[in-house]
Each structure stands twice: as C-alpha cells, then as structure tokens.
UniProtKB/Swiss-Prot annotation:
Gene Ontology CC annotations of this record: cytoplasm
Subcellular location: Cytoplasm
UniProt cross-references to InterPro entries, sorted A to Z: Ade_phspho_trans, PRibTrfase_dom, PRTase-like, UPRTase/APRTase
GO terms, molecular function: adenine binding; adenine phosphoribosyltransferase activity; AMP binding
Protein name: Adenine phosphoribosyltransferase
A single BP term in Gene Ontology: AMP salvage
Keywords tagged on the record: Cytoplasm, Glycosyltransferase, Purine salvage, Transferase
The protein's role, per its UniProt record: Catalyzes a salvage reaction resulting in the formation of AMP, that is energically less costly than de novo synthesis.
Oligomeric and partner information: Homodimer.
Amino acid sequence: MNLKDYIATIENYPKEGITFRDISPLMADGNAYSYAVREIVQYATDKKVDMIVGPEARGFIVGCPVAFELGIGFAPVRKPGKLPREVISADYEKEYGVDTLTMHADAIKPGQRVLIVDDLLATGGTVKATIEMIEKLGGVMAGCAFLVELDELNGREKIGDYDYKVLMHY
C-alpha cells in the first residue's frame, strides 16, 4: 500500500515557506490506518519491546493502537503541567528557543525495552528529549518508529545509533 496517497500536503502552513504533511486522511481511512499500525507493530515485535512511549499529541494517535495490538503499556510524553503525578523533564531546542517535555517518573521500569512511536520525525528535538527521559528512568531504547520523516531536516542525527523505522520519506 502506498501510504503517501493518504497524506495531504498543505503549502505555507502553519506559516509561509512551510510544507505541512497532514496525516488526517491516513487516519480517516481504516485500511490505511490499520496498515500503518500493523507495519509498526511488526517492527516492535521484531525489537521485542515492553513499552511504547509517544509524544503528544499525534504520538498518542499512532502509539496507542500499537501498544494495544501488542498487549503492552503506553506512556505519554507531555508538555509541562499536563501530567498529574511526579514527572521528570527534558529540554529540547526549537527553531526559536527552548521547550520542555515531561513524563511520569514511574512510567518506565529499569530494563524495560522501549519503542518511541510518533507521527513525524522533523528536526529530532522531541525524540532526543524523549530518549533522554527514557534512559534517565533506566529504560533500554529498542528503537523509534515514525509515519513520516522530513529528510532535509536531518532529525535522524538526533537519534544517534538507535535503530528506527520510517514508513514514508519526504
């Protein structure tokens, strides 16, 4: 299945000069959505993962069905102030400044094999901060999986030597 057939391209959104890749049409098509999830489930199975971690918000949309299919847990990564219990945090650089991500301090058990699942790999800041938190909690990075990678932004460099799977490249 050519998943790119289910990605909408919007020029100059959210601002001039940006080409936005919208996964909404993929999610709206049950066959395409299911196919994408199954591809990541197979990757996760091969990696023998114990836990899925997904950054808000679209990481939830992709990561939760993967965790469900595998019968394993899902840990959300959120912006500050969105999680109700004790959290750890990691900062990451954005185009104009620094932002912070958090996750529950008990989300990952030491030794758990963790797969990060998100919709998009762009600059890699989000995934780098997420890796930092997983490792701080003693998790073992099994890999990362993304629906889309924007190749020209070189986000893969922030993943380092960790394995990753991408379903579509732009």
